[in-house]
Swiss-Prot record:
Listed InterPro entries: Chitin-bd_1, Chitin-binding_1_CS, Endochitinase-like_sf, Glyco_hydro_19, Glyco_hydro_19_cat, Lysozyme-like_dom_sf
EC number annotated for this UniProt entry: 3.2.1.14
Disulfide bond annotation, renumbered to this chain: 25-40, 34-46, 39-53, 58-62, 95-158, 170-178, 277-309
Protein name: Endochitinase 1
Active-site residues from the entry: 139 (proton donor)
A molecular function (GO) term: endochitinase activity
Signal peptide: 1-22
Amino acid sequence: MSFLQALSIFLLLLLYVVVGSAEQCGRQAGGALCPGGLCCSQFGWCGSTADYCTVPGCQSQCSGSGPAPGPGGLTNLISRETFNQMLLHRNDGACPARGFYTYDAFIAAARSFPAFATTGDQATRKREIAAFLAQTSHETTGGAGWAAPDGPYAWGYCYNRELNPPSSYCASDPNYPCAPGKQYFGRGPMQLSWNYNYGQCGRAIGVDLLNNPDLLSSDPTISFKSAFWFWMTPQSPKPSCHNVIIGAWSPSSSDRAAGRVPGYGVITNIINGGLECGKGWNAQVEDRIGFYKRYCDILGVSYGNNLDCYNQSPFGNGVSVDSM
């Protein structure tokens, strides 16, 4: 064997080792989730043992039970009729997104996130559904600022695009550069914004959202997937919304000193704490709580403790969304 042949084989083997050792999930892999409901370890690897699933440390899908139940469990927790009752006026003629957000798209998107509403007892699972739909209802509400029929908390999911975006939400980022002519304003149930969020989300769900950001307002299943991705994915120093609502997040001493304790209020802090938390009472936080209480009542579960973030300091840098 010649020297050049030996060198070529060595380089191929080296490439194989480097590529084969790439992390599989979490912040090391652009927010990707493990397949089959497996836990993502703090180092970005997928597995089902305590080394992968122990909290703190585990990044996502931290149930510790390996593959989670399929979406059939979700349909047993929230039926089509209940979904329609909760999002009562989403298809009203006054809502620009009427006809877009469907129950079928919600269930289909959940198949990509099998840990959603499958962890803990039935009350915990229903509470996660209520919290997810409440936060996203606030982001897409059509019931604020007027005497809405059936009250403001029956008007979630009225919008799928940000109103009058102040910019294109394009930041300099070598990993997720903006595509020419594309804008990354809020879209979908969670009103995902900024190119780096579109890039991370797209990588995790297998869709090129940097070049096709409008998919979040034209394809309802992909739109719901973007919201589930945000919900399930921790972005340091923030835990995931999922881990908070199922009780898998343990606040650090710094968190407690900042007033960040387990409960629905921390989820608001994760989503939009920089604008809404640590400022005392405000209408935005109250609106999020109002949706949550209504949905918990419909599902027949208690609210839990610490619903607001009025006295919580915001988290540091990480993924966030801008409210409409």
